[in-house]
């Protein structure tokens, strides 16, 4: 279907109502924009906290200017970035969401690590 014929995006709560799950399973909205942006990786620790890698600057890294994009969306930039920690600060982050009142919604968020540039994965250790 052409993009101009696509239906408008649903609000988060409306989108959850459209899901169909099997048997006695359930689904609920834990967190939505603007509290979260472009989640790429989600993990839960032993305390039930949700750790989220937010890929907020995809597809272009901070500090670089796109100069050419081909038919396959491969991008050439004005320069090669310096490797961390010398390169530009990014906008990606790892955040920790927690439901402290037991209602199924994340009511606290803490940025664990920020200023990442094109972060693409994370792994949790013991106790987060």
Describe every region a protein language model picked out.
Residues 1-128:
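Beta-propeller domains with acidic blade repeats across secreted/periplasmic ectodomains
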